[in-house]
Amino acid sequence: MTAALVDSLRRPGRLITVELRPPRSGLSAAEGMDSWIDLNHSIRHLAIKDIFVFLTDDAVGSREEENLGHLAANVGSDVPLSRLVPFLTCKHTIEHCLLYADRAHSLGFEALTVVGGDVSTGPPRCVPHSYMLRQRIRERQPGLSLGGWANPHRDSSKQVEYIGSDDFSAEFYLTQIVSHHS
């Protein structure tokens, strides 16, 4: 069985997705709660309109709140988890990453985007390249559709080579057209 996201990507026509970031960690309890409430409203509004929502995980090196726990606990039963696609970076221990994927699958998420994470900041990656983590996750959770990322700041022909490789281990990939890092 493929994820709703993968099925939608294969269909002709337009597909709109949105990437959101959880609140940064270190906020006061009140600020954190307000941020999560605002984010939750956005997620619910988009997902109910059949828009896929990707929620990042420390992708740019800023400490963020853990996304999976929030999504599972707070979005509500009227929001299909098939429309929500959490990110997982390699910037955690391998044990955390594998358990995260197990949790995602057991909670009912159909897809997970696994990316390396910014090597210039924050904790080190548990594996050198995200495809290695996707391979490990695939062994444990073969029913979870996995995605990757093509880096728009690297050589484009090399990025295409990576995503076209059999060991990329992903059913979908993302990239950025415009970046706030540029």
Regions found by a protein language model. Give the residues of each.
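Glycine-rich, proline-tolerant flexible connector loops at the mouths of alpha/beta enzymes
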Residues: 22-31, 47-69, 116-126, 182
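Glycine-rich anion/phosphate-binding loops
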Residues: 31-37, 89-103
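Alpha-helix-loop-beta-strand connector modules within alpha/beta enzyme cores
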Residues: 61-86, 127-149
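Catalytic cores of alpha/beta
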Residues: 94-105, 158-168, 182
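Internal, glycine-rich beta/alpha segment that forms the wall or movable "lid"
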Residues: 117-174
